[in-house]
Amino acid sequence: MKIGILYICTGKYIVFWEDFYKSCQKYFLSNSDNVKKYYVFTDSDKIYGEVGNPNIHRFYQEALPWPDIALKRYEIFFQIKDILVEDTDYVFFFNGNSLFLDYIVWSEIAPDKQQGFLLSLSWNCYDGNQKFPYDRNIRSTAYIPYGKGDIYYQSGLTGGRTKEYIDLLQECREQTDIDYYNKVIAVYHDESHLNKFLLDRKIKVLSTNYGRPEKWKKPECAKMIFRDKYKIFGDEIYKMKGRRRKKLSASVFYRIAYLIKIKFHFK
């Protein structure tokens, strides 16, 4: 089976690539019958492992300011849709700070026909859908009214059969473009548009075992984590995301409060 892996590492985020690649090669669908092809979008002129490796494909991507690099994610990937159709059976996207810790086999994550051949990650740590951090701005194409939806998805891990995944990319790209034209930014950027696309769809839902923040203590047996950016970059992470540490906007304040809440939920 031909597995496509989408990955963005612009600017200083290139620091994550080598560890991600090594851990992915070792732990993710490492059966010899699977061929993993990496599609890496970066502004670096070289990346670890690419020399003499036909399965690493580097594409130039400028380091866009935050949150453009997140919002433009679907457009960036959609640009190589023809390559993905030709070269892959399934496609997965992983956040730049993803790191595999244990083996993940196909039977664990494979989405079937009843699941629309799509999958996404959900931390499942909310007290009912009224508390889901959906975009409640009616002007946004990502808008979801209160009372709707059964699951909130995290955008750090998504995937599926190539055809269905490209459909996801196309619709989310179109939603984002409409919002850009109307000068609207979805509350949690690409994640808000992902949740709108997946609203009321039956897909394969992956638990926190397949992607939790490094800071969380549970689950202890997580097979993949999202590395702590603050541990790598320190206070510079705030500059990289275009904000000052001591002067947070209301939306950022509530985002931090929300993360603190779910952190204690998993202790």
Label every model-predicted segment.
Residues 1-69, 80-87, 232, 248, ...:
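N-terminal anchoring/stem segment of glycosyltransferases
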Residues 100-138:
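Conserved donor-nucleotide/metal-binding helix-loop-beta segment in metal-dependent transferases, i.e.
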Residues 36-43, 92, 117-118, 203-205:
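Short, hydrophobic beta-strand segments that form beta-sheet elements in well-ordered domains
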Residues 10-12, 45-47, 63-64, 98-100, ...:
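Short, solvent-exposed loop/turn segments at secondary-structure junctions
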Residues 61-94, 102, 106, 189-198:
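A conserved donor-nucleotide-binding helix/loop in the catalytic core
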Residues 15, 47-50, 100-103, 108-109, ...:
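Short catalytic/ligand-binding loop motif for oxyanion handling, primarily in non-cytosolic enzymes
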Residues 141-230:
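Catalytic core and acceptor-binding pocket of nucleotide-sugar-dependent glycosyltransferases
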Residues 51-64, 74-76, 108-119, 221-225:
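Active-site regions of enzymes building and remodeling cell-envelope glycoconjugates
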